[in-house]
Amino acid sequence: MNEPKLISGNANLTLAKSIARRMSVHRGMAVSLVDARVERFNDQEIFVEVYENVRGEDMYVIQPTSNPANDNLMELLIIADALRRSSADRITAVIPYFGYARQDRRAKARTPISAKLVANLIVEAGIDRVLTLDLHAAQIQGFFDIPVDNLYSAPVFALDIEHHFKGQLQDLMVVSPDVGGVARAREIAKRINAPLAIVDKRREKPGEIAEMTVIGNVAGKKCIIVDDICDTAGTLCKAAEVLIENGAVEVHSYITHGVLSGPAVERVTKSVMKSLVITDSIEPSAAVRGAPNIRIVPTAPMFAQAILNIWSGTSVSSLFETDTLVPIYEGMYQRG
């Protein structure tokens, strides 16, 4: 069986290189990115040229479709087309952050279901499988006519919480920032054996919060807000304020995808939150890396193992278990 081969667009080269390094550690052999050129013509058309022979190879395209979402999506599709026309045997799109996932349904009349359209485009480009992380809506997996492996941040976040709050777990309260995110927050609460609270928000219009109410007693607790996406951070920072007003002694947040657009970083640094923990599913900007209360949990170990499991035909769902991730993260976290 040929070794898996990785190729990357421009969306998150740092993560792609980290995945290659981690796979090298796991496999005991050198894994590097396939040599390719992904460029723009003067009119901003995307051009891809693969410099290595990929005929009959098992290819993994690492490309989150984050900001600029349209450019990064087109890069993914064109890379896949180049690989298919170069006779690659199988193409897996590794999409750490799946853009357009928030458009998974018609919220009002005469609007699109853009997530379904993107799924159709991915399939038509010749991609055989998708590997992603914390889809905004789990039902998006059903939009595809190809297999989709959706990894979860909950196991590694639970490990991180156990590590950073060692000896304080009894003081923690996991908080969902809205009713729709309860299942996600409950999963982490169950893993760390903590109670659950909910912030019920009433939204007047997108981007504007009219009212927030805390469901649950957070007095004297160190609150851990759990969500999948932080965009402008307005809702998150307001939720942190409301929790403090309701008696919480500290507020920390664990968010899978740090979109952090516009004034988000400034809001977070000035907020009452002691820390915001995100993954590197989206390439962190210099401002994000320099923020004193933002910390980044790497996803490369998890993606590297998932790719190896797909390649070898072994279980990907084994990565949903916290204990499985301990050796994968190589001493970064210790249990007990």
Curated annotation (Swiss-Prot):
Top-level enzyme category: transferase
Residues noted as binding Mg(2+) 2 in the record, renumbered to the chain: D178
Binding site for ATP: D43, Q44, E45, R102, Q103
Catalytic activity: D-ribose 5-phosphate + ATP = 5-phospho-alpha-D-ribose 1-diphosphate + AMP + H(+)
Residues where Mg(2+) 1 binds: H136
One Gene Ontology cellular component annotation held by this UniProt entry: cytoplasm
Essential cofactor(s): Mg(2+)
Positions bound to D-ribose 5-phosphate: R203, D227, D231, T232, A233, G234, T235
Cofactor note: Binds 2 Mg(2+) ions per subunit.
Domain of life: Bacteria
EC numbers on record: 2.7.6.1
MF term (GO), any: magnesium ion binding
Keywords tagged on the record: ATP-binding, Cytoplasm, Kinase, Magnesium, Metal-binding, Nucleotide biosynthesis, Nucleotide-binding, Transferase
One annotated GO biological process: ribonucleoside monophosphate biosynthetic process
Function: Involved in the biosynthesis of the central metabolite phospho-alpha-D-ribosyl-1-pyrophosphate (PRPP) via the transfer of pyrophosphoryl group from ATP to 1-hydroxyl of ribose-5-phosphate (Rib-5-P).
Family: Belongs to the ribose-phosphate pyrophosphokinase family. Class I subfamily.
UniProt-recorded name of the protein: Ribose-phosphate pyrophosphokinase
Organism annotation: Cereibacter sphaeroides (strain KD131 / KCTC 12085)
Top-level taxonomy: Bacteria, Pseudomonadati, Pseudomonadota, Alphaproteobacteria, Rhodobacterales
Name of encoding gene: prs
